[in-house]
């Protein structure tokens, strides 16, 4: 259980930093057209970016002691996997499926590999 807790803490720190510095504002502002689905909707992009920013801040905050925050970690997993599913449904090309949806699904589902409560406890309260 302890090594899973440590790995989960590392994941929360790394993915939290990615959320803050890469996924939130960096991608829409720096890469613009290249990584954005078309047609662009800047208001929606910024709203989604702020959600990822907030999630990143909380992930870093709870990384030191993730076990009391099972509900939030379950939310992260479900939110990212369902986000990837919606991206998969609306993907207009193979490139979007392979790059965007796969990355979100992998990063979002990764905690299930070292889920410290045991997979039988996923979404159980």
Question: Can you annotate each of these PLM segments?
Answer:
Residues 10-15, 35-52, 100:
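A loop-to-helix transmembrane entry motif
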Residues 17-25, 42-63, 75-85:
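Core segments of alpha-helical transmembrane spans in multipass integral membrane proteins
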Residues 32-38, 61-65:
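Short, hydrophobic transmembrane alpha-helix segments
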Residues 63, 85-102, 117-121:
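Membrane-helix boundary connector in multi-pass membrane proteins
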Residues 71-88, 105-110:
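Hydrophobic alpha-helical membrane segments
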Residues 105-125:
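Membrane-water interface at the C-terminal end of transmembrane alpha helices
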């Amino acid at each position: 259980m302890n090594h899973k807790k440590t790995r989960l803490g590392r994941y929360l720190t790394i993915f939290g930093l990615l959320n803050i510095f890469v996924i939130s504002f960096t991608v829409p502002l720096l890469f613009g057209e290249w990584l954005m689905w078309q047609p662009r909707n800047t208001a929606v992009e910024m709203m989604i970016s702020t959600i990822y920013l907030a999630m990143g801040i909380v992930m870093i905050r709870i990384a030191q002691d993730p076990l009391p925050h099972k509900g939030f970690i379950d939310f992260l997993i479900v939110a990212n996997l369902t986000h990837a599913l919606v991206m998969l449904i609306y993907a207009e090309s193979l490139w979007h499926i392979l790059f965007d949806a796969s990355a979100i699904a992998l990063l979002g589902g990764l905690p299930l590999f070292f889920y410290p409560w045991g997979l039988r406890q996923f979404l159980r309260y």
